[in-house]
A protein has these predicted regions:
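Conserved alpha/beta-hydrolase "acid-adjacent" motif
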Residues: 218-224
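Conserved acidic catalytic loop of the alpha/beta-hydrolase fold
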Residues: 75-92
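Flexible "cap/lid" loop of the alpha/beta hydrolase fold
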Residues: 105, 109, 116-145
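Conserved alpha/beta-hydrolase catalytic His-Asp/Glu region
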Residues: 129-132, 148-201
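Conserved HGGG/HGGXW glycine-rich cap/lid loop of the alpha/beta-hydrolase fold
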Residues: 9-67
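Gly/Ala-rich beta-loop-alpha elbow adjacent to hydrolase catalytic centers
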Residues: 96-100, 104
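Catalytic histidine-centered segment of alpha/beta-hydrolase-like enzymes
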Residues: 242-254
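Short beta-strand/loop motif that positions the catalytic acidic residue
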Residues: 205, 211-213
Length: 265
């Protein structure tokens, strides 16, 4: 599977994204927050989502490279909307994990014509005690500009201990990545998650939605996914035995997503 890293201008910056597949339909994936971003993982991401490649042209977005202090999830959704407009994409199927799921919620509220169907995984529509504690810890750790510490506190919450042990070599390498400048950016992302609250506007989301969550989510709590689905009146699937990043841990995750898109046609 060949994956290409491309970019589209948004304001004065270049918004990078990973593209693969040659299908007639558009799938837009919005990644969760991370210290180093996802562009170096293009081939691995394309391999993981290979089942979508025949039916879809897949584009995977992170965030703009430069994020000023005070950048909000709504701002990030506006950046994504600008990128999709520039690419001529509308009525796409969307998949967002964690903060990516928050961005998709806001996009579906502000630019509903861009979204045909949405899968929101391990996300939330408003703060809760678990998310407040998590994002405060991540923000404050990142403000110390110590990438090893940021990786440690984030990996421990995102993945189960078993998954980290099974992928010990990969995590050992990843734990040493990042720069002090990327820590500052991570702090902005964490604060945007900490204060995100779109509950007053959720009724504006009219597209079909599948919420996927996991009991025992140490970042946002499983209850956050159940609450989001209840407010939207949509389908929800809750996993057990996996971590916050269930999209990486659950073997049937991607097939479940694809099946939902098919049901929405």
């Amino acid at each position: 599977m060949t994956a290409n890293v491309r970019s589209v201008p948004v304001g004065t910056q270049k918004y990078e994204y990973i593209e693969f597949g040659r299908g007639e339909k558009d799938l837009v994936v919005v990644a969760g927050m991370s210290l180093c971003g996802i562009m170096d993982q293009a081939e691995a991401i394309a391999a993981a989502y290979a089942m979508f490649a025949e039916e879809y042209t897949v584009r995977v977005f992170d965030r703009l490279p430069d994020l000023p202090v005070g950048k909000t999830v709504r701002d990030m959704a506006a950046d994504l909307a600008c990128a999709l407009d520039a690419l001529g994409i509308d009525r796409a199927d969307l998949l967002g994990t964690s903060q990516g799921g928050m961005i998709i919620q806001q996009l579906a509220i502000d630019r509903p014509e861009l979204v045909r169907a949405a899968v929101i995984s391990s996300s939330a529509c408003c703060p809760n005690p678990t998310s407040e504690e998590t994002f405060t810890l991540w923000r404050d750790t990142a403000l110390r500009r110590d990438p090893v510490a940021v990786n440690d506190v984030s990996f421990r919450r995102i993945y189960t201990e078993k998954f980290r042990e099974d992928c010990a070599n990969a995590f050992a390498a990843l734990s040493q990545t990042g720069t002090p400048e990327q820590c500052e950016r991570f702090a902005v992302l964490a604060e945007a998650c900490r204060v995100f609250d779109c509950t007053a506007e959720l009724q504006k989301i009219r597209c079909p939605v599948l919420v996927i969550g996991v009991w025992g989510d140490m970042v946002l709590s499983g209850k956050a996914s159940v609450d989001l689905a209840r407010r939207l009146g949509c389908e929800v699937h809750m996993y057990e035995g996996f971590g916050h990043c269930v999209c990486d841990e659950a073997p049937d995750f991607r097939q479940r997503v694809l099946d939902f898109y098919h049901r929405c046609r």
